[in-house]
Amino acid sequence: PDFEGNSVTLSEQIKGKVALIDLWASWCGPCRRSAKSMIPVYEKYKSKGFTIVGVAREKTVQTAKAAALQDGYPWLNLVELNDAGNIWFKYCVGNSGGGTFLVDQEGKILAICPTAEEVERILEKMLK
């Protein structure tokens, strides 16, 4: 669900766009630093067919919401409460806080855990 408890289908949110799927957690410092580094890239390319969707691994929605607000994430964030969908295991992220996946308009993975600079280089080529 999103932070308001609404059910959201991830594939509908990223359909036809180059997207960064950001699996993160409030307690994962490296995840949050990585996400914050993506804010300028998101702002530059969001009107050109790029989006980011965060999925927080939390015990409560409030914890994720507070962290996203504190860090200033301008994109849609969803929450997986108590590993209900086993997302981290499905994407081989295991017990860690998170990981990122850059996918193209058809959902093909372009990069796993790319830096902001790598994402920008890829977007420069794809979204001219």
Give the predicted meaning of each segment:
Residues 20-21, 52, 100:
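Hydrophobic beta-strand anchors of alpha/beta hydrolase catalytic cores
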Residues 48-63, 73-84:
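Thiol-based oxidoreductase modules, predominantly thioredoxin-like and allied folds used
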Residues 21, 64, 77, 107:
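Hydrophobic, well-ordered secondary-structure elements that form the walls
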Residues 23-40:
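Conserved redox-active cysteine motifs that mediate thiol-disulfide chemistry
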Residues 15-16, 47, 95:
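Active-site acidic short loop of glycosyltransferases
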Residues 69-73, 80-127:
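Thiol/disulfide oxidoreductase modules built on the thioredoxin-like
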Residues 1-19:
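A short beta-strand-turn-helix
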